[in-house]
């Protein structure tokens, strides 16, 4: 599955930082949870802008010490003409190195002396530097420099609540853009020719019709998240009869111990919990919400046997790292796939194949439009199907 093209999102980002949509040029800040495709959007933008005019920086990977960060972004720079002496070459100390990094972001120029474009992936990870002497306001300093810089920037992060808090008093130049789920059309465009082949019919016709059927189902199961969609699509192409795709069985396989979706969910779960406070209590709340979503603070407190005051603190810490969301004072998982993973894997023993099949069955039915599972369970069809679909949602048991 190729990097998905997201035309509407890409146009919005490009229009924001070049000012073509009216008004002053802005700095897009892309917000999205695990697997929503923030990185793939930045890599697509680099291709569209040109590798000589844009630098992608994976902040999460290179934010070690300020000195090494500066050396890393300089070494990978596609730009010419920035003066190393002005950027603090040989200057001792973390503060000097960080100031030199900010100066580089401000003064580097693209070929022809045009503005350089910096694509900063997981920019909040620069907060790592705040443990060094003299660097207590790293993110505020970054925002101040970017606001007045003559270059162009696109920022991403997986932490929505923290970003809103950081930018609350920032200049209006920053434009927050949530990364929307992939549409069925965007998923369909990434499917390889043989990935959606159905059981009968000519190869070309069936490939086209198969992709039309497969893309919406993959989108529903994956919650529109590119990483889940890619894993489901790649696995399903190898599991169906005679090459036919079976995304439901693929999801069951991927959620087993060692499966790629299981591994991705475990990473997201542990990463976010370790960035929050109250590790054990927060895990307990996630267990409660995995059993039943849409609970109020009082209902969660009763299940935890904790006071409403302490439970409110725990919930705020989970919201701070975007593991849960609150709608009308009722709490749910931000990522439905992560909830499914918690139901399966946060237990005394690893899940059996029967456990996985049962939970995946319930998960898929809950995400389908209400009419489809009802008709399927009743054995009713409005019209005779033109062809058999390879996924047997009701027959997983």
Which stretches of residues belong to each language-model region?
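A short hydrophobic beta-strand->loop->alpha-helix junction that borders the nucleotide-binding pocket
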Residues: 31, 55-64
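Walker A/P-loop nucleotide-binding motif
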Residues: 24-43
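Short, amphipathic alpha-helical interaction segments positioned at domain boundaries
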Residues: 338-367
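Conserved NTP-binding/hydrolysis module of P-loop NTPases
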Residues: 54, 64-88
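Short amphipathic alpha-helical interaction segments
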Residues: 305-320
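Conserved small helical "lid"/interfacial subdomain of P-loop NTPases
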Residues: 179-213, 221-224, 232
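Winged-helix-like regulatory helical subdomains adjacent to P-loop NTPase cores
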Residues: 230-306, 355-360
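Conserved Walker B catalytic segment
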Residues: 96-161, 165-169
């Amino acid at each position: 599955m190729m990097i998905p093209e997201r035309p509407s999102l890409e146009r919005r980002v490009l229009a924001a930082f070049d000012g073509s949509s009216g008004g002053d040029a802005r700095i897009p800040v892309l917000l999205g949870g695990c697997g929503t495709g923030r990185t793939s959007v930045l890599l697509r933008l680099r291709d569209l802008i040109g590798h000589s005019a844009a630098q992608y920086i994976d902040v999460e990977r290179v934010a070690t010490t300020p000195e090494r960060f500066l050396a890393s972004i300089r070494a990978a720079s596609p730009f010419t003409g920035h003066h190393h002496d002005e950027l603090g070459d040989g200057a001792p100390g973390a503060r000097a190195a960080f100031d030199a990094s900010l100066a580089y972001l401000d003064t580097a120029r693209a070929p022809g002396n045009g503005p350089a474009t910096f694509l900063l992936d997981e920019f909040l990870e620069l907060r790592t530097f705040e443990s060094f002497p003299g660097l207590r306001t790293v993110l505020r300093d970054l925002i101040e420099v970017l606001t007045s810089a003559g270059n162009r920037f696109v920022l991403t992060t997986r932490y929505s609540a923290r970003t809103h808090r950081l930018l609350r008093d920032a200049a209006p130049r920053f434009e927050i853009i949530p990364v929307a789920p992939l549409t069925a059309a965007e998923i369909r465009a990434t499917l390889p020719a043989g990935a959606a082949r159905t059981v009968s019919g000519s190869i070309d016709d069936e490939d086209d019709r198969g992709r039309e059927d497969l893309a919406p189902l993959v989108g529903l199961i994956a919650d529109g998240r590119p990483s889940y969609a890619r894993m489901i699509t790649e696995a399903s192409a190898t599991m169906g009869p005679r090459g036919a795709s079976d995304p439901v069985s693929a999801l069951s396989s991927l959620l087993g111990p060692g499966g790629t979706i299981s591994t991705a969910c475990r990473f997201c779960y542990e990463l976010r919990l370790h960035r929050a406070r109250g590790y054990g209590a927060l895990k307990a709340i996630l267990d409660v919400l995995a059993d039943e979503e849409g609970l109020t603070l009082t209902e969660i407190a009763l299940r935890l046997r904790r006071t409403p005051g302490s439970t409110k603190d725990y919930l705020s810490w989970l919201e701070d790292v975007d593991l849960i969301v609150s709608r009308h004072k009722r709490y749910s998982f931000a990522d439905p796939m992560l909830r499914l993973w918690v139901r399966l894997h946060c237990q005394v023993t690893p899940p059996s194949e029967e456990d996985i099949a049962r939970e995946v069955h319930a998960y898929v039915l809950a995400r389908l439009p209400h009419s489809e599972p009802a008709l399927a369970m009743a054995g009713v069809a409005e019209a005779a199907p033109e062809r058999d679909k390879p996924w047997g949602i009701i027959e997983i048991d």
